[in-house]
């Protein structure tokens, strides 16, 4: 039976490349499949004791590394676009598109873990001895992703030594690590971009002053309502809760308190960047802030998916080797991996915590005509 979607030969453009036996060769050459498909060297086979699941292990990790390369490629292009004083809406749209691509890739990587879990612990044990001293900790590309995203060296969990020491005397790897540490990370560039959010200017709309005033009014209304509470215990509880909220707001309104939290590692953004992020969150329905809000949401998605990938990896490792054995690279294995699930590895932590500082929609300072005109132009 012929293909129902194929037209007859008379319908084809004379300039079209004819199908022939050379098509497969061209395809293979373009993708360099001879190298790609010949890169699965099973050490168990070299030892004349082939283990079937070692092939799956190699393929899965090679697929990870290929996708890591694409993520780095996208991050580098996004960083180039963000590294400018003015970012027009066309570039913002492109940044959003590429961040969304990274999100979809990471979802794919998270979903790859269950494929590895089709291998039983006993299957893994059959070839694990061939892996040492190799370790996932030695994935240069994953370290570059972390650095380009904005994971700080001081935030990293110690792994017997500095994370770059595992690359030994590999100058290419060490130079790549140093370059990723020295160049502006996505976090730094997003921070600069947020600091330039229109409407933050003290001599303009001055969102921050208006926001503080709205918070004061909101808390005053809460206190007034609490004082009308007839049950003394309930009243005291509500007043205590309001005071706690007041302290939370004070941590963003007092620059010194904010800076102390940054130094302690509890916050990442500068004070100005935090103001910009809050303003974009409040006015995300305004056309000018729609794309920036999408951008911030995608950054959170990336952080979340990397955390999910780490978590899935941790659970898989525990299933394969338990929680007491050392990793093949000499790390504490499960214990080390579990420690990377903390907020210290969450680059855009401040975006996740923005909901802490929300106020009711009706209390959000309305945009005046001057700022609306500025946002349009």
From Swiss-Prot:
Gene3D superfamilies reported for this sequence: 1.10.287.3810, 1.20.58.480
Keyword terms: Dioxygenase, Heme, Iron, Metal-binding, Oxidoreductase, Tryptophan catabolism
Pfam (any one): Trp_dioxygenase
Free-text comment on the cofactor: Binds 1 heme group per subunit.
A molecular-function term among this protein's GO annotations: metal ion binding
Catalytic reaction equation(s): L-tryptophan + O2 = N-formyl-L-kynurenine
Binding site for substrate: 57-61, 128, 328
Metabolic or biological pathway, per its Swiss-Prot or TrEMBL entry: Amino-acid degradation; L-tryptophan degradation via kynurenine pathway; L-kynurenine from L-tryptophan: step 1/2; Pigment biosynthesis; ommochrome biosynthesis
Reported cofactor(s): heme
SUPFAM superfamilies in the record: Indolic compounds 2,3-dioxygenase-like
EC number: 1.13.11.11
This protein's record includes keyword Oxidoreductase: yes
Binding positions (heme): 313
GO biological process, one term: L-tryptophan catabolic process to kynurenine
Stored PANTHER family: TRYPTOPHAN 2,3-DIOXYGENASE
Function: Heme-dependent dioxygenase that catalyzes the oxidative cleavage of the L-tryptophan (L-Trp) pyrrole ring and converts L-tryptophan to N-formyl-L-kynurenine. Catalyzes the oxidative cleavage of the indole moiety.
UniProt subunit comment: Homotetramer. Dimer of dimers.
Similarity comment: Belongs to the tryptophan 2,3-dioxygenase family.
Protein known as: Tryptophan 2,3-dioxygenase
């Amino acid at each position: 039976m012929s293909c129902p979607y194929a037209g007859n030969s008379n319908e084809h453009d004379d300039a079209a490349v004819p199908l022939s036996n050379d098509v497969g060769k061209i395809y293979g050459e373009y993708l360099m499949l001879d190298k790609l498909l010949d890169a699965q060297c099973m050490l168990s086979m070299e030892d004349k004791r082939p283990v079937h699941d070692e092939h799956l292990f190699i393929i899965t990790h090679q697929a990870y590394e290929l996708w890591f390369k694409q993520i780095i490629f996208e991050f580098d292009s996004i960083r180039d676009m963000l590294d400018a004083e003015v970012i027009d809406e066309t570039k913002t749209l492109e940044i959003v598109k590429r961040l969304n691509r990274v999100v979809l890739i990471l979802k794919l990587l998270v979903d790859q873990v269950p494929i590895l879990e089709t291998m039983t612990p006993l299957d893994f044990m059959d070839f694990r001895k061939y892996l040492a001293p190799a370790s996932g900790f030695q994935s240069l590309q994953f370290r570059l992703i972390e650095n380009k995203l904005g994971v700080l060296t001081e935030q990293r969990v110690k792994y017997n030594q500095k994370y770059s020491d595992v690359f030994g005397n590999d100058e290419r790897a060490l130079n790549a690590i140093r370059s990723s540490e020295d160049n502006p990370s996505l976090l730094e560039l997003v921070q600069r971009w947020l600091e330039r959010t229109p409407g933050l200017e003290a001599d303009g709309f001055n969102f921050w002053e208006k926001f503080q005033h709205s918070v004061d009014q909101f808390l005053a209304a809460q206190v007034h309502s609490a004082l009308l509470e007839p049950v003394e215990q309930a009243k005291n509880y509500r007043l205590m809760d309001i005071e706690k909220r007041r302290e939370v707001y004070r941590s963003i309104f007092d620059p010194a308190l904010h800076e102390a939290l940054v130094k302690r590692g509890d916050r990442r953004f500068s004070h100005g960047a935090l103001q910009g992020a809050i303003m974009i969150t409040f006015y995300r329905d305004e056309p000018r802030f729609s794309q920036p809000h999408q951008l911030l949401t995608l950054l959170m998605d990336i952080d979340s998916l990397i955390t999910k990938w780490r978590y899935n990896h941790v659970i898989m490792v525990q299933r394969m080797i338990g929680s007491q054995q050392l990793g093949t690279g000499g790390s504490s294995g499960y214990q080390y991996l579990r420690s990377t699930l903390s907020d210290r590895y969450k680059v855009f932590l401040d975006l996740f915590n923005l909901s802490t500082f929300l106020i009711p929609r009706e209390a959000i300072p309305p945009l005046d005509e001057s700022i609306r005109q500025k946002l349009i132009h």
